[in-house]
Amino acid sequence: MMRAVWEALAALAAVACLVGAVRGGPGLSMFAGQAAQPDPCSDENGHPRRCIPDFVNAAFGKDVRVSSTCGRPPARYCVVSERGEERLRSCHLCNASDPKKAHPPAFLTDLNNPHNLTCWQSENYLQFPHNVTLTLSLGKKFEVTYVSLQFCSPRPESMAIYKSMDYGRTWVPFQFYSTQCRKMYNRPHRAPITKQNEQEAVCTDSHTDMRPLSGGLIAFSTLDGRPSAHDFDNSPVLQDWVTATDIRVAFSRLHTFGDENEDDSELARDSYFYAVSDLQVGGRCKCNGHAARCVRDRDDSLVCDCRHNTAGPECDRCKPFHYDRPWQRATAREANECVACNCNLHARRCRFNMELYKLSGRKSGGVCLNCRHNTAGRHCHYCKEGYYRDMGKPITHRKACKACDCHPVGAAGKTCNQTTGQCPCKDGVTGITCNRCAKGYQQSRSPIAPCIKIPVAPPTTAASSVEEPEDCDSYCKASKGKLKINMKKYCKKDYAVQIHILKADKAGDWWKFTVNIISVYKQGTSRIRRGDQSLWIRSRDIACKCPKIKPLKKYLLLGNAEDSPDQSGIVADKSSLVIQWRDTWARRLRKFQQREKKGKCKKA
């Protein structure tokens, strides 16, 4: 009898140790209490800090699903007591239809009054290999500190505690109790717990004695003996280990006196059953340090009241638009709050990029999506193409970017300088939007060269007045009538340009023409640019009108690359093709240009 008393005291001491650990014992830092504060998730300066929900008995008042309950149909059961060496049995009736004689599962999680014990009770003699299970759904993820059961019957000889992290879809062992660990659960007896296996269930024979015959306690501490418990904040393994959505207790084997097979075995078997007065699951609503309480949502589901810009049932992700750094669990040192993306008020959505986060020294990884108000960039921090910054407004202003409004004819593109708004103008065009001709230029009818240089009067010794030599017929044949331009002629020449003859000067055996190159349709190896340039033609070619050129006229010139006298400009000779320009040729020459890029000239 004294032994039973001492065991009961030891069991109560174990529960007291658990409660003491919950209140601040070493290795259970995640369950440390906090002093009352106006806002437990912020310090006195308003800075975020870790906050955790209150410690509760998560089983209290919840329904427990059991695989066996006495009373359907009504059945006799006998309670064994001992007086010295004598065993006494007092028999009663379990009747589920009579509230005074029923032992329903609700008694497992009701208010436990030691002066008026209420006990759930199984059917009689459900012995191994049959088992009896108690399944408790917590309603959401909890970080469990302990699971305890107080018995009205003798404690089981073998029992297992399981947990689920996915609302009962899968189960993993939490703890085993048995005098025959290897036989019952294929586990070694009291295996040492190391850092390598601290997330695994162990089997022990503690709390498996048959006595006391009533009032015995089994209490399992989830972190007791786990090596990383002292550094719980930095141990994802143990954080996962204590997490559960459901708890299941499986009673595998009854303790007996060995009289179940004797002559009065029916009376003996009616004395063996499982009966529990109290099932407790001590722990906290799992909120990863980002909430101080759990509340019911619109669907009446239990969820964390998330802070620190977090979201989710367990505050296990960042809320929308707060992806500038990755989600992390809060610790005693760092709140690890989620940070909003910096989009300068021009975007409503963003995403996280780990590569950018690493490159920033782990400070910022947010990338803004769908920038509005004509902005662009990772942070919507510059103006998109076709717009420029209005420096009189902050970048966060809705009208911080102004349209370039580049002239459709005078500008060479739609993109302007991001700072000044200056559009890229074509040759001879000026103005911030390229809307007027520059000094010394006049407007033309060509959309390609809308501004051309104002012509200069030809010199007194004009190229057209040169006397024709007598041997021109044998030297070259001047073109007569209309010349046609085709792909074959285009491919044979090194360059093809549209020119405007401005003036001509005699330079020894050469004529130097100052021309304005309006368009370049082919340039070969020589880099020919639009604008003013020199055209060199030998005097004899000009005298024989090969080619025939007049000042102030526009021509299509197709020629071959040749060094000019001053190493600049282009050279034409009797083999060059010079045709007075027609605006209808522009489209044809652009087609030739495209075909050349596709390699058609090689086949021509």
From Swiss-Prot:
The keyword Signal applies. Keywords: Apoptosis, Cytoplasm, Disease variant, Disulfide bond, Glycoprotein, Laminin EGF-like domain, Repeat, Secreted, Signal. Its main location: secreted. Residues 1-24 form the signal peptide. Residues 285-340, 341-403, 404-453 form the Laminin EGF-like domain. InterPro entries: Galactose-bd-like_sf, Laminin/Netrin_ECM, Laminin_N, LE_dom, LMN_ATRN_NET-like_EGF, Netrin_domain, Netrin_module_non-TIMP, TIMP-like_OB-fold. Residues 472-601 form the NTR domain. Disulfide bonds join 119-152, 285-294, 287-304, 306-315, 318-338, 341-350, 343-368, 371-380, 383-401, 404-416, 406-423, 425-434, 437-451, 472-544, 491-601. GO terms for molecular function: DNA-binding transcription factor activity, RNA polymerase II-specific; RNA polymerase II cis-regulatory region sequence-specific DNA binding. Gene3D superfamilies: 2.40.50.120, Galactose-binding domain-like (2.60.120.260), Laminin (2.10.25.10). A motif (Cell attachment site) lies at residues 530-532. Binds to its receptors; DCC, UNC5A, UNC5B, UNC5C and probably UNC5D. Binds to its receptor; DSCAM. Interacts with DCC. Interacts with APP. It is linked to Mirror movements 4: A disorder characterized by contralateral involuntary movements that mirror voluntary ones. While mirror movements are occasionally found in young children, persistence beyond the age of 10 is abnormal. Mirror movements occur more commonly in the upper extremities. MRMV4 inheritance is autosomal dominant. This is Netrin-1. It comes from Homo sapiens.
